[in-house]
Amino acid sequence: MRLHDLRPVPGSRQKPTRKGQGIGSGLGKTAGRGQKGQKARSGGGVRPGFEGGQMPLYRRLPKRGFHNKFAKEIIAINVDRLNKFEDGTVVTPELLLETGIIKKIGDGVKILGGGELKKALTVKAHAFSESAKEKITAAGGQAEVL
């Protein structure tokens, strides 16, 4: 079997409806849009959130909060994610990024104490929780703050 031999399962694909193709098609003339009105026109229709002139929900509800432009984006991961590495590995934020454990470093990486660590690793990160430090040292490794 080759790629050009592949065919869809019979009945799995329908032909697209061709609207406005004559009265006999059942979708001629107005093409399923009804008679006149805003929704019958090209480009017609109301924007998302429009409620027919009634005060829309997004304006009835109060504003809340603000965006803190000084907020630090700390990427947190649990110690059990570090079991992926071999014994004796020096785990850095760059290595975590390369292996796909984190998507970006942001303003720092913090190691949290979720799960169990079974490998003796030297972990270098910007911050550690107390339980994470204990688990890393208990497994025979070191926790170094960058």
From Swiss-Prot:
Q: Check the record and name the SUPFAM superfamilies matching this protein.
A: Ribosomal proteins L15p and L18e
The cellular component terms of Gene Ontology attached to this UniProt record, alphabetical and capped at eight, are:
cytosolic large ribosomal subunit
On the tree of life, the source organism's domain of life is Bacteria
Q: Which InterPro entries match?
A: Ribosomal_uL15, Ribosomal_uL15/eL18, Ribosomal_uL15/eL18_sf, Ribosomal_uL15_bac-type, Ribosomal_uL15_CS
Q: Name one GO molecular function term.
A: structural constituent of ribosome
Entries under PROSITE patterns matching the protein: RIBOSOMAL_L15
Q: Cite a single Pfam family from the UniProt record.
A: Ribosomal_L27A
For this UniProt record, the keywords arranged alphabetically read as follows: Ribonucleoprotein, Ribosomal protein, RNA-binding, rRNA-binding
For whether the record's keyword set contains RNA-binding, the answer is yes
One record GO biological process: translation
TM annotation in the entry: none
Q: Where is the composition biased (Gly residues)?
A: 21-35, 42-52
The annotated region (Disordered) lies at 1-56
Q: Mind telling me which HAMAP family this protein's record contains?
A: Ribosomal_uL15
State whether it acts alone or in a complex, and with which partners, per the record: Part of the 50S ribosomal subunit.
Cited function: Binds to the 23S rRNA.
| Listed NCBIfam families | rplO_bact
Q: Which family does it belong to?
A: Belongs to the universal ribosomal protein uL15 family.
User: What protein name does the entry list?
Assistant: Large ribosomal subunit protein uL15
Species assigned in the record: Carboxydothermus hydrogenoformans (strain ATCC BAA-161 / DSM 6008 / Z-2901)
